[in-house]
A protein has these predicted regions:
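Aliphatic-rich helix starts adjacent to a transmembrane/signal segment
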Residues: 14, 18-62
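Single conserved hydrophobic/aromatic residue that forms the stacking wall/gate
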Residues: 1-13
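Generic anion/oxyanion-binding catalytic loop in active/binding sites
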Residues: 1, 46, 117
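Flexible, low-complexity segments enriched in proline/glycine/serine and punctuated by aromatic residues
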Residues: 24, 52, 56, 62-211
Length: 211
């Protein structure tokens, strides 16, 4: 036993050396375990951000559809309006970069001021765009269509993990597929419209709703 060995004896020194090696091995094993945990947390965080953004997109779509239903006269031609064509005022056509630079200034607050249907649509879009920006990384959106044919909504957000090789230290951001009009299924739901001019790293999620 180390406790009973003579101080300075060969046996005592040997036992102390074995104990030191055991401690070093234990530290090495612990370090490897901690690195594994850190890697797992990083991967979990990556998928959590993407899942969170998609979940936010669904909530934002519900928010916009409710606003349009409350103010339908500003959403363009209705089913009953045969022979009459009006353009929806719930439209967003600016590309991704332009929206990032927009100040989203509200000039008329329709929560405290009586607004026309047109003013309400403008207010709704500004509030909604603020929520898009706050809910998703560098969030932006495109909105087209009308209440007769349905409103097409494209949500856009920046995802730093959208790269060509996730396992490479020199991975580069890639550009999402641009919609051609012939896509189906998941490809149709995740392509970015050409009008968005989405840069590398931006993901898109497309939806359609009829008020």
């Amino acid at each position: 036993e180390i406790a009973s060995c003579l101080v300075g004896s060969e046996m005592c020194i040997r036992d102390r050396g074995v104990t030191l090696i055991e401690m070093m091995v234990a530290v090495l094993v612990l370090s490897i375990g901690l690195l594994g945990i850190a890697g797992l947390q990083a991967a979990t965080s990556k998928y959590k951000i993407n899942t969170w953004s998609r979940s936010s997109a669904s909530l934002l779509l519900s928010d916009l559809s409710e606003r349009v239903r409350i103010n339908p006269d500003a959403a363009g031609t209705s089913f009953a309006g045969e022979g009459v064509t009006t353009v929806s005022e719930y439209l967003l056509a600016d590309d991704w970069a332009t929206q990032q630079a927009s100040g989203l200034t509200i000039t008329t607050n329709c929560e405290t001021t009586a607004c026309t249907t047109s003013q309400r649509a403008t207010y709704d879009l500004l509030i909604w765009r603020q929520r898009v920006r706050d809910s998703m990384p560098q969030g932006a959106a495109l909105v087209s269509g009308d209440r007769r044919n349905g409103l097409d909504v494209t949500m856009m957000w920046f995802d730093k993990e959208q790269v060509d090789d996730p396992n490479s230290a020199t991975a580069a951001l890639v550009t999402a597929p641009v919609c051609s009009g012939s896509e189906t299924g998941m490809a149709q739901q995740t392509c970015c419209p050409a009008a968005a001019s989405a840069p590398a790293g931006v993901r898109c999620a497309r939806f359609t709703f009829v008020p």
